[in-house]
C-alpha cells in the first residue's frame, strides 16, 4: 500500500512541477495584460447588463446550462504513463490507494472553474431570484459540490465500459440531469429537484453495479491521460517550446486548391511549407476557425456598441496571431531546411505573408459581424483597428517575440 502511495506522490509532484514550469512562461506573457483589460471590460459590461436584464431572458435556463457544462466535463486524472502497462499491471490488485488519491486530487483541482462560475453567476442569481439570500445561494453551492462529485464518479464508472456509445449516452444523460435539477434548484422548486435526484441515485447504483463486473482498462486510461497532457502542451506551446508536444496532421484534400495558389518558385519554398502546415496541422487552422466563430457570435448577439465591437475584433485577431506564433518554428526539427538555398529573411517574410493573409480574412469576417451588430460605424472601426494591428503592431511585436525565443 505504501509503495502505491509513494508512486502517486512522486507522480503528483512531477506533474505539479511540470505544470508550474509552463505556467511560469504563460502567466509572464504580455497576453495576461490584454486578458486583464478584456476581463475588466467584460465585468463592466456584465454589471450594466445585470441592472437592466431583458424580461424575456431565460436566466434560470442559462445558469443551469452553464453550470451543467462545467459539471458534465468532470474526469479523473490518473497520471498513468505508457510504461505502466508493463510495470504496474502486475500490481493492479493493489491500485486502490493510488486511484483514491487520483480521485481526490482530480475533484479538488477541478473545483476552480466551478467556484469561478459560481462567483460570476451570483449577481445574476440575486437579480432574478425573489427573496434570494447568501444562505440560499450557499445551499445551491453545496449542491453544486455534491453534483460535481456525482458527475466525477459517474464518469469514472463509464471508463470501465468498452462501448463508446454508452460513454456518449452517459455524457448526454448527465448533462440533461444536471440541467434539469439545477433549473429546479435555482428556483427553489425542490419537489421536482428531489425527483431528479432520485433518478440520479438510481443511475449511480446501476453504473456502480455494472462497473464491478468489468476490469480496469489500462490502455484507455493511459490514452486519456496522454490526450489531456498533449492538450495542455498545445496551449503551453503557444508561449514557449514544448519538446513533449506531438504534432498531428490531417490530409484535408479539399483544401489542396489553396496550396496551388502558391507559385512553384525557389523563393516561395517556405511560403509553400507554411501554407501546407497551416492547412493540415490540427493546431493552426482550427484555432483560426474556432476563434473567428466564437468572437463573431459574441459580437453579433452581445455587442451593440461600435467601439466594443471593434475592441472585441482587435482582441480576437491579437489572440489568434499570438496562437499562430508557433507556426514559424513548425519545421525546426527538420535539419535539412538549413540546406535550402533560401535566405532566413525570406522565411520570415513568407511567414508574415501567410499570417497577414489569414488574419485579414478573419478581420473581414469579424468586421461583417460588427456591421451586423453596430452598423457601418462598427464595420469601419473594426476594419481600421484590425488593419493597424495586422500590418503594424503584430509584425513588430511578433518579431520581438521570435528574437526573444532565439528563432531569429
Curated annotation (Swiss-Prot):
InterPro entries: EcsB_ABC. The chain crosses the membrane at residues 30-50, 53-73, 111-131, 134-154, 180-200, 284-304, 308-328, 351-371, 374-394. It is found in: Cell membrane. GO terms for cellular component: plasma membrane. It is a multi-pass membrane protein. GO terms for biological process: establishment of competence for transformation; sporulation resulting in formation of a cellular spore. Coiled coil: none annotated. Keywords: Cell membrane, Competence, Membrane, Sporulation, Transmembrane, Transmembrane helix, Transport. Disruption phenotype: Cells form colonies in which certain architectural features are absent or less prominent than those observed in wild-type colonies. The Ecs activity could be important for the development of communities. Presumed to form part of an ABC-transporter, it may form a transport channel. This is Protein EcsB. It comes from Bacillus subtilis (strain 168). The lineage of its organism: Bacteria, Bacillati, Bacillota, Bacilli, Bacillales.
Amino acid at each position: 500500500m505504501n509503495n502505491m502511495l509513494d508512486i502517486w506522490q512522486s507522480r503528483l509532484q512531477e506533474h505539479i512541477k511540470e505544470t508550474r514550469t509552463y505556467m511560469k512562461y504563460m502567466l509572464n506573457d504580455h497576453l495576461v495584460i490584454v486578458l486583464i483589460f478584456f476581463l475588466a471590460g467584460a465585468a463592466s459590461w456584465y454589471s450594466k447588463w445585470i441592472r437592466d436584464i431583458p424580461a424575456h431572458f431565460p436566466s434560470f435556463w442559462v445558469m443551469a446550462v452553464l453550470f451543467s457544462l462545467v459539471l458534465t466535463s468532470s474526469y479523473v486524472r490518473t497520471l498513468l504513463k505508457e510504461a505502466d502497462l508493463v510495470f504496474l499491471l502486475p500490481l493492479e490488485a493493489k491500485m486502490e490507494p493510488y486511484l483514491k488519491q487520483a480521485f481526490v486530487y482530480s475533484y479538488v483541482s477541478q473545483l476552480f472553474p466551478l467556484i469561478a462560475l459560481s462567483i460570476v453567476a451570483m449577481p445574476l442569481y440575486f437579480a432574478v431570484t425573489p427573496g434570494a439570500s447568501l444562505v440560499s445561494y450557499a445551499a445551491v453551492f453545496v449542491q453544486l459540490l455534491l453534483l460535481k462529485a456525482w458527475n466525477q464518479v459517474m464518469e469514472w464508472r463509464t471508463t470501465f465500459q468498452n462501448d463508446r456509445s454508452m460513454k456518449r449516452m452517459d455524457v448526454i444523460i448527465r448533462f440533461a440531469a444536471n440541467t434539469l435539477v439545477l433549473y429546479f434548484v435555482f428556483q427553489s422548486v425542490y419537489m421536482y429537484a428531489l425527483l431528479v435526484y432520485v433518478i440520479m441515485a438510481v443511475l449511480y447504483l446501476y453504473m456502480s453495479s455494472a462497473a464491478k463486473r468489468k476490469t480496469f482498462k489500462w490502455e484507455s486510461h493511459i490514452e486519456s491521460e496522454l490526450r489531456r497532457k498533449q492538450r495542455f502542451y498545445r496551449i503551453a506551446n503557444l508561449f514557449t517550446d514544448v519538446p513533449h508536444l506531438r504534432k498531428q496532421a490531417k490530409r484535408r484534400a479539399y483544401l489542396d486548391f489553396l496550396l496551388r495558389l502558391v507559385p512553384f518558385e525557389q523563393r516561395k519554398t517556405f511560403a509553400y511549407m507554411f501554407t501546407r502546415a497551416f492547412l493540415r496541422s490540427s493546431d493552426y487552422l482550427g484555432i483560426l476557425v474556432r476563434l473567428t466563430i466564437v468572437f463573431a457570435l459574441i459580437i453579433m448577439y452581445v455587442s451593440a456598441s461600435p467601439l466594443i465591437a471593434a475592441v472585441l475584433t482587435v482582441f480576437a485577431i491579437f489572440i489568434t496571431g499570438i496562437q499562430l506564433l508557433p507556426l514559424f518554428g513548425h519545421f525546426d526539427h527538420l535539419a535539412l531546411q538549413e540546406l535550402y538555398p533560401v535566405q532566413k529573411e525570406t522565411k520570415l517574410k513568407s511567414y508574415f505573408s501567410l499570417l497577414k493573409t489569414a488574419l485579414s480574412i478573419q478581420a473581414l469576417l469579424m468586421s461583417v459581424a460588427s456591421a451586423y451588430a453596430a452598423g457601418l460605424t462598427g464595420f469601419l472601426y473594426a476594419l481600421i483597428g484590425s488593419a493597424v494591428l495586422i500590418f503594424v503592431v503584430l509584425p513588430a511585436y511578433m518579431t520581438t517575440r521570435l528574437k526573444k525565443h532565439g528563432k531569429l
